[in-house]
Amino acid sequence: MGRSKKRSRASSSRLNPLRKAGSNDNNKDTNVVNKKLQPLLQNLSSVVPNDRSIALSSISVLCEDAHMRQLLLKEKLVPIILNKLLNDSNSDIVVESFGLLRNLSLEEGYDVSIYLWRSDIWTSITSNFGRIVESLSALQAAEQQPQLKPAGKSKIESKRLLFDFADNLLSLVVALSNGSDDILNEILTESKINEIFQVISQLLKYGVEKLPINLFNTTLDLIYDLSSESFEFIDHVSNNELLSQFLNGLSPALHPQANELTKVLIEGIHCQFLDMKITYDQCNKMIHSVCHSINNIDPVQLVNDINNPVEIGPATSKDESSKVITKIKDYNAKRNESMIKLQSIEIAIDLITAIIEIVASKYESPESQEVAIPEELINTLTNFLPHVFMILKDTFTSRILIGWNNLIWLFVSLSLTELSGELLTTLWSYVTQLDSQDDLSIKIGRMGCIWALLKLIFPDGAFESENRALINVQMLNNSGFARGIIEEFQNNNDLELQQKCINVLSTYAMIQGQIDANKEIGQFFIQTLTQLNVRPEILIEMTNSLFQIYGDASYDYNEPIFVRGGFLSILKDQVVPNLRQQFKMVDKNKNPELKERCHDCFTTLDSFIHYKMNENSTNQ
């Protein structure tokens, strides 16, 4: 019910959602490709391992810039990695190559992920899984023998490389699973799950406390991520004795270097495996625990750290090569620290959003054992969480809007209309004035919040003049607001966004005491329903909205708008023929569900027309 979606598959900004896209200038691009990128790509084929290594590291850094990444992808970066580097004689290069593929999969989402999958990347992953299991087993056996002297530099480096390799492979699996639902479904097959479990089990046998914290977090991330997508995966884990024991005792105390990401992931795993069995008290404690884990992260400083990378130029001599390597290592260390903080906040927001959804599901479930939501949780939801969301709103806008959306709808379900007037006013100002900057996810999230807020502020479709919060938001008979939503609908072609615009307009139109605003919305709906080439989903949504808005003659806007505006004759003479024609074009075989919705809508429209005709004759 409350499965926490860690990130959207439509989003290609997991690795660095804060970085702005680079500029696009064809002449500059040609110059950059010829003078900067091609030499690096050519060095990937150099016979000198050090040249290949420096080139690969430099390319990895460049790929963090969206524009540079696109240029490199156009120059066939992925095929070069697959064909030349995954089987390189230098182990460091192989390990880093898988890491770069992971980054590209996270950044580019579907396109790169599906290309890798169709190029049989899973075979490379599993063959290296086998090597990792063997190496871990040998390492564990060697460490159990009496050590006459401390491990040498080569052994320490070999162990580091092994752990980095496991980290990159497991995180690549996570990246691929997030790139495509088809890939996810294949990864979740029993045979592939068992291959993944073999690696994780060997890591646990080696000793959690001896693993680098990054690898431990990656292991937790994989469990959290796949459990957020599949109940079957949870069953697989629960049926695995070693993994089940590990999760039963899972706590930050297991690892001496546990950080904010460790703590958030552990809470996330607990939430996924408890799901609807979770109590209200556990929900409350989990929210506070997650927020406490990220409390010391400054989102403003985090943005500055991520958006201001160092410039790493090409090496011109042996001494320069050494300096470049040092620069790259320093940069990677700082970047890794920033990305841990970034991912911690991302997952924390998603987890809180999922917990809110679970609370709503439990409250609405007739099978729930808990009748009332305790006062402590109510206080967390109404006072604590809004403060947290407001702190993070400017940096993690898209995610926070989803969190706000869930929280406001929960307020609606709980009939929590007596919220702080200051909170309502501040939140309304934020979502209505938010600059989406052509980010579709922000536009959809913003419109969803506006819809939920209207439901919260006007629960019965009535304006209460003594309510200062309603006066402060200046929403009574605001035709300009209605026109703004209509423009948003007309200027965008995304179905989900358009549907949310209709929901906002429909809810606003039903508020009595504002004839002008209702007229603006009613005429827009009626005119749209007479137009050709409107998607059937939109026609259905608008028609159903008309049923709700004008379903009762007692509404103060019914007589001046619906009756005197001649809506009934327009419905009979123009809308019915248009909908009949448009709905006929929906293929029953290709889209049976939509066809059924069209049929239901048309049938209801016929009944609605007859109802309004009888209503008018009765009132005359």
UniProtKB/Swiss-Prot annotation:
Coiled coil: none
Chief site of localization: cytoplasm
Subcellular location: Cytoplasm; Nucleus
Tree of life domain: Eukaryota
ARM repeats: 25-64, 66-106, 181-221, 258-299, 340-386, 435-470, 471-510, 564-607
GO cellular component labels: cytoplasm; nucleus
GO biological process, one term: protein import into nucleus
Family to which this protein belongs: Belongs to the nuclear import and ribosome assembly adapter family.
Miscellaneous comment in the UniProt entry for this protein: Present with 2600 molecules/cell in log phase SD medium.
Functional description taken from the UniProt entry: Nuclear import adapter that specifically recruits the two functionally and topologically linked ribosomal proteins RPL5 and RPL11 (encoded by RPL11A and RPL11B). Guarantees that this cargo pair remains bound together from the time of synthesis in the cytoplasm until delivery to the nascent 5S rRNA in the nucleus.
Record's protein name: Synchronized import protein 1
Source organism per UniProt: Saccharomyces cerevisiae (strain ATCC 204508 / S288c)
